[in-house]
Amino acid sequence: MKITVSVSALRAALTHSADKDVRYYLCGVYLDCRVGRIVATDGHRLFIGDVEAPADMDSFIVGNADAERIVKACGTGRNIVSSSVSFSITKTDNKVWITAELQDGSKFTFPALDGMFPDYRRIIPQVVQSAIPAAYNGQYLADAAKALAIYRNRDPKKAGVLVHPAGNDCAIFTDGEPGAMVLVMPMRLTNDAAANARAVTMSLEWFRSAYPGVSAAA
């Protein structure tokens, strides 16, 4: 059995995987074959993309270094040799081995990243409330736009995102098309809850006074 993933999806997921994290199982890209998804998270934001996968194939984690090696071997632009990668797995004793095959026949075999990937589905908000204000790390917003553009194989410099905040839950970022999304945890402007509330109020008051013709409500 094999799962085939576009190089664009693999590159997009790598923008959200953890780097040198003690939770080593986050330092890679998770292929959830049960539901056909490619997933990556660093604990603060989460990338999810759709892929086609056999439902009876075991899920596995491709470590960052191996994923980056595969992406590099696929090439880019005029030097592209493969636009997709087929993954298969074999088990020996307590070890899971992954074989990645490119469209030109090149193959890479390496061990799967050990550990259990967290149940990412639990943090997906059940209710999205666009009226609740929240603050987000600015770099994470840029990374969300970049990841979604890469997934679509588009220019990240021209990418925009739709933001669907959910209060204290993760906000959902999409590009208006099905197949991929990024989840980002909101951040506190300060460690003082009262100060954060005042900051929201002050921002709205300033907005109303500076632009009296525009309605602004929390």
Regions found by a protein language model. Name each.
Residues 1-218:
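DNA polymerase processivity clamps
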